[in-house]
């Protein structure tokens, strides 16, 4: 039986995961649709996937986060500061016009994805350290629920709201939502970890060892090909629906709500 403290801890991590996913899913969905409506080429829309690059290369600065965290408070500071930047950037995008400030919007979104990726680094590390081995499956389920739930809301429900209230009204609400999702972590005093002892830094030889392990390139190749096909297909589905004459509301229902369940 799960006690109240553990339930609160799991709910706290669910809030963190869904807070990072909803805005990212929304931007990744609505911008290709808006670009196609403005007659951008499919090549340009395909290149838009590069805005997700911070999440792909976040391993480059994850050692920095890990090196400067030893206590629960350290992890919380990384999470709070990252999410605050995330919310500020989302709010800033709301003040801009999509047509007139397109490249500024893209720049701010990329920076916001850096912030959300940094939050994810700290959140994952805290989750690993705060839960025992037998409870890690439960916090992993919170991560999955936050990811799929955030995808459904961000690429589905918010697209429906976007159709009703527009860009400039929706994004400030989204920024506030990100901050509200930090409240459980702020009030949660039950998440405790054993302070880490100073450890030896990874050397070039350690990195080289990882990439020279037996069969490692087969695994990397499989992941690369699997996700390349999946992401490439999804990137073109929504612009294709625009070409077929579907409205933003219909695309949100089909691609976001129904598509997530499938």
Segments and roles (model prediction):
Residues 54-63, 253-262:
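Transmembrane alpha-helices of Major Facilitator/SLC transporters
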Residues 80-100:
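C-terminal ends and interior cores of transmembrane alpha-helices
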Residues 81-87, 168-187:
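Symmetry-related core transmembrane helices of the 12-TM Major Facilitator Superfamily/SLC fold
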């Amino acid at each position: 039986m799960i006690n109240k403290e553990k339930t609160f801890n799991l709910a706290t991590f669910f809030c963190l995961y869904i807070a990072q996913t909803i805005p990212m899913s929304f931007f990744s969905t609505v911008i290709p649709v808006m670009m196609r409506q403005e007659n951008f080429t499919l090549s340009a829309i395909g290149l838009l996937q590069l805005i997700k690059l911070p999440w792909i290369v976040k391993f480059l600065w994850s050692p920095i986060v890990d090196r400067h965290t030893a206590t629960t408070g350290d992890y919380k500071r990384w999470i709070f500061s990252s999410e605050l930047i995330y919310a500020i950037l989302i709010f800033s995008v709301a003040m801009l016009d999509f047509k007139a400030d397109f490249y500024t919007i893209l720049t701010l979104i990329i920076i916001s994805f850096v912030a959300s990726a940094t939050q994810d680094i700290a959140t994952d590390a805290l989750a690993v350290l705060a839960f025992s081995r037998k409870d890690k499956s439960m916090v992993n389920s919170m991560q999955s629920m936050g990811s799929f739930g955030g995808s459904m809301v961000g690429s589905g429900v918010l697209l429906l709201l976007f159709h009703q209230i527009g860009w400039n009204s929706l994004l400030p609400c989204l920024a506030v939502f990100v901050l509200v999702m930090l409240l459980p972590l702020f009030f949660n005093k039950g998440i405790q970890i054993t302070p880490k002892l100073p450890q030896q830094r990874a050397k070039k030889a350690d990195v080289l060892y990882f990439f020279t392990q037996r069969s490692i390139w087969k695994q990397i190749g499989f992941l690369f090909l699997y996700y390349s096909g999946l992401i490439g297909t999804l990137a073109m589905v929504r612009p294709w629906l625009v070409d077929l004459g579907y409205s933003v509301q219909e695309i949100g229902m089909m691609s976001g709500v129904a598509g997530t369940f499938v």
